[in-house]
């Protein structure tokens, strides 16, 4: 049956008056592949496109909004419309966008017009993405329009950076040559966003600003005049990019030297030499430091002016991350040595390593601000190292030992002694979890080969402390008790009673004021703890604390969110597989917690299964059967008796093979060596005994009429030697249960048998219990 669809001409009549669910139904109908028909261009498609153009040219924001969505859906699902009408749609869209941007002040005062402006911008972006990559469309529709679209987006970027920066970033990367005439103007806009308004935006927008600034250096600058002895050298494609990275690096050293007025660098001469070796512009080669910021103004009398240092380093770190992490169409030369040196220098700016200047120790406010600023500078070093380790991985293996030793300086330590200051640790919780993320990335390349175990021991204690849900009410109760002990006037008591009544929830519901830990932080903590448990043997106390944390939090989160996060499942699995020095396993607890998780590791541990190749390999049994044919009775009377003995012996030993019991013949084979085994011919496989209950049943020995034919069963000593056809077989001490076969001849009257004797092959266990049975 042919597919029946609504004609586009009918949709054209409805779309102008449609609202709400009716408009959504029209958009859903436009996704149908039935309309991808070139024969409809002059009929239904032409009518519907004319209606869409009318909506886009309307003065009502709602009609423009509907036209934008209809154009985006139709062009995304109909290649015929895209190829035939993209040029016309793009022209109308950027014309309407220009009218909104030119009157942005009036537009921003109306929520409807502001929403329409954002919809127009996104529709232009969608249409450009659909056109890009198609040669004819790009040449005829996109490239001529970019000279008008780029200035509009640059102007709007000053007001709506989070909206325009992603579009401009793609244009810089995909249409670098077309963007070149606007590079200088765009650089001015980005410089203003970086130096003045950077802290006003969220992290995503800050990252977009830095990425656009980095991609701006894809545009080649005018070639500078080179020296005569350098003119014959070919300019590399990343020359402009590399010079920009070095320009950012050069701005770190003056800021680090400025911290020399706060910290006493003179106590460590190696520190001074290390700072002097940081990247610096070389005047001999004509390197010029591109000053992005104005000179920094810091006054010790105004302690909060020190925050300018932290702000400057933060912006430089974000710019550096963009330069080293963004993909380009050509290979890059990244100065890893200089970047890592900068990060290590930032991590060394700590009161754990260097003391404050003497004149600054007396002022409490200034000291507190300095410590906070230094902590922020150290954190920026961690952020840059985190980006490097993710982008370049094992390329920085050479620097791992120095990086790990520098990271230990980030852990706050009390003024006296080497104890960890957990109060400061809890105040910088997010920063510590970023440190754990960096450690997880670094240790993933080295594992147990890392020698800096002190750092991991400290971080284990810190991690277990931070994942605990705590409140800050401990000091509150102390201050309340102190306030009650102070003598107060009647008015003060009334004010205090009013305040205490408003804060009654603190006393009645203290659990409501507990600081929660985010799930992403749990993931980083669990990944770190799994890494530590897997690669090193921890002290028993830490191992027990990790087990307690994993089990308790798994139960708690399962009750709160209805499932156990994947990171906790991995941590529990690691604890079971690597119990450390603990004698007891938490396997039953872990299996009970993860019974609905379909954990394959626990499934194998609880239900072990041997591979089928081990169960269905009959080769070993056939070799043993051939070896038994060579054994003979020590006191055999005739060839017929020997044949009967061998046959009975094979039946018993076949049963022992089925149960995996080691026999004396196996010991004889091992002593003689593999050479003797190979020389003996292989025999056909015999069928396995069907009745397994007969394997270990001792055969009753019938009383013999003649004492000469009766044989005594004796338990051989571990060092006793027995003769077998002139050969001496030494039976050593065997820890396993040995089944020895002693061939005896018994005579009995068998009416249906041709022979008057029957051979009985009793089974003797080499154990004390068997001695008692023999005596009976």
Swiss-Prot record:
InterPro entries: RIX1_N. The keyword NADP does not apply. Transmembrane segments: none annotated. GO terms for cellular component: nucleus. It is found in: Nucleus. Disulfide bonds: none annotated. Pfam families: RIX1 (PF08167). Residues 699-776 are annotated as: Disordered. GO terms for biological process: rRNA processing. Its main location: nucleus. The keyword GTP-binding does not apply. Keywords: Nucleus, Ribosome biogenesis, rRNA processing. Residues 736-750 have a biased composition (Low complexity). PANTHER family: PROLINE-, GLUTAMIC ACID- AND LEUCINE-RICH PROTEIN 1. Belongs to the RIX1/PELP1 family. Component of the RIX1 complex required for processing of ITS2 sequences from 35S pre-rRNA and the nucleoplasmic transit of the pre-60S ribosomal subunits. Regulates pre-60S association of the critical remodeling factor MDN1. This is Pre-rRNA-processing protein RIX1. It comes from Kluyveromyces lactis (strain ATCC 8585 / CBS 2359 / DSM 70799 / NBRC 1267 / NRRL Y-1140 / WM37) (Yeast).
